[in-house]
Amino acid sequence: MNYPVEWRISDSPVDYPQAIAAMEERVAAIRAGTAPELVWLLEHPPLYSAGTSADPRDLVDPGRFPVYETGRGGQYTYHGPGQRVAYVLLDLKRRGADVRVYVCNLEEWLIRTLARFVVKGERRTGRVGIWVDRGGGREDKIAAIGVRVRHWVTFHGIALNVDPDLSHFEGIVPCGIREHGVTSLWDLGLTPTMDDVDCALMATFPEVFGAD
């Protein structure tokens, strides 16, 4: 049986281990057909997470925030207040069973969301995530992507910088990329609320992934 995608928004920061446990439980339920697919919008307390490709040398300041190893793809990233995390739990068996297409769709979702704020988000070959051209040869990352797939059910997802403390990224080499920086919507001179961003994410999701 196919259910419509459920949307969940957490108003308070969610501890990382709690979020992982909740995703694990939901993935099993989606696979069993007892729960609908889920998009979970939340923020975390300040932390660093290490993906399966993380290089320990990229953890510059290991004592700054808690560090969690996780099974998602990618390297080190930062999560914290002011960053909208969207955990996306979808059943790819009924969505084409193509992980590469799924990641491209996450990128497209972010690009369309940023366009709602008149920001041109761009892909970069060989670099997962969404980037903003700052001019003069400078480009900064505004959104990260890290996914895991179990029995064709996705979890983890995306992290869009709305108004985080960008200095918190200094404790790592984000995604192992030393030559580029990070930015946020507020750093670009925009002032959307988290509710504004959530509305944009919810409006553009069906454009990319289809209506329920």
Curated annotation (Swiss-Prot):
GO terms for biological process: protein modification process. Pathway: Protein modification; protein lipoylation via endogenous pathway; protein N(6)-(lipoyl)lysine from octanoyl-[acyl-carrier-protein]: step 1/2. One of its GO terms (cellular component) is cytoplasm. It catalyses: octanoyl-[ACP] + L-lysyl-[protein] = N(6)-octanoyl-L-lysyl-[protein] + holo-[ACP] + H(+). InterPro entries: aa-tRNA-synth_II/BPL/LPL (IPR045864), BPL_LPL_catalytic (IPR004143), Octanoyltransferase (IPR000544), Octanoyltransferase_CS (IPR020605). It comes from the Bacteria. The record marks K141 as: Lowers pKa of active site Cys. Substrate binds at R72, G73, G74, Q75, Y76, T77, Y78, H79, A144, I145, G146, G157, I158, A159. Pfam families: LplA-B_cat. It is an enzyme of class 2 (transferase). Its EC number is 2.3.1.181. One of its GO terms (molecular function) is lipoyl(octanoyl) transferase activity. HAMAP family: LipB. Belongs to the LipB family. Catalyzes the transfer of endogenously produced octanoic acid from octanoyl-acyl-carrier-protein onto the lipoyl domains of lipoate-dependent enzymes. Lipoyl-ACP can also act as a substrate although octanoyl-ACP is likely to be the physiological substrate. In the reaction, the free carboxyl group of octanoic acid is attached via an amide linkage to the epsilon-amino group of a specific lysine residue of lipoyl domains of lipoate-dependent enzymes. This is Octanoyltransferase.
